């Protein structure tokens, strides 16, 4: 049996588009808000499977992506929290770093927390960022909106997770 996210409890109106990593034009008519954790295998699946579709929609000016790196208390996801500290605020650089973090996830996914930081610095050559306030804002926003699981994606009235198929995603973007 496949687990399905209960979207009925999520308060989409409490999700904002002003904090997070913004990919694409501010003039785009729609915002695709993505709550992800870099250690989550389902977030990796979402990121990789939606990458081309979202990249095309951003390039065509249809959407602006707002990626919110969500720190989670779950032990396995805390490694993602550490990696979040190393993602740059520059959108293009951040997108590349997120891609690198997901590509190497199987390497660092079981490291001790200190080792994740060392891997980010020494192997991936990421620099630690002063983003604690932003991370706290995103966590508070997720709590207010009752977002419990990652990935959670909000596009207008639509709230979904990584199980969305490409055709449905494209239809939501085109609406």
Regions found by a protein language model. Give the residues of each.
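Sterically constrained small-residue positions within well-ordered secondary structures
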Residues: 23-25, 56, 144
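N-terminal targeting signals for export/organelle localization
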Residues: 1-12, 167-175
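Structural alpha/beta surface segment adjacent to cysteine/selenocysteine redox centers
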Residues: 36-39, 44-117
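Generic structural "secondary-structure junction" signal
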Residues: 23-25, 72, 162
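Short, flexible segments with low predicted structural confidence
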Residues: 11, 28-29, 55, 113-114, ...
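C-terminal cap of thioredoxin/glutaredoxin-like
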Residues: 35, 46-54, 118-175
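Conserved S/T- and glycine-rich ATP-binding loop of Class I adenylate-forming
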Residues: 32, 40, 153
């Amino acid at each position: 049996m496949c687990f399905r996210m209960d979207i009925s409890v999520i308060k989409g109106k409490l999700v904002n588009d002003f904090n997070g990593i913004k990919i694409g034009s501010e003039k785009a008519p729609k915002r695709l808000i993505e709550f992800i954790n870099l250690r989550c295998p389902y977030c990796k699946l979402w990121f990789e499977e939606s990458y081309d579709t979202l990249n095309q929609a951003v390039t065509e000016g249809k959407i602006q992506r707002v990626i919110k790196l969500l720190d989670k208390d779950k032990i396995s996801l805390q490694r993602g929290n550490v990696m979040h500290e190393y993602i740059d605020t520059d959108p293009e650089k951040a997108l590349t770093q997120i891609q690198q973090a997901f590509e190497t996830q199987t390497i660092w996914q079981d490291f001790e927390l200190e080792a994740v930081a060392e891997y980010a610095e020494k192997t991936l050559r990421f620099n630690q960022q002063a983003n604690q306030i932003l991370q706290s804002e995103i966590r508070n926003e997720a709590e207010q909106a009752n977002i419990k699981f990652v990935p959670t994606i909000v596009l207008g009235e639509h709230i979904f997770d990584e199980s969305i198929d490409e055709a449905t995603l494209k239809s939501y973007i085109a609406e």
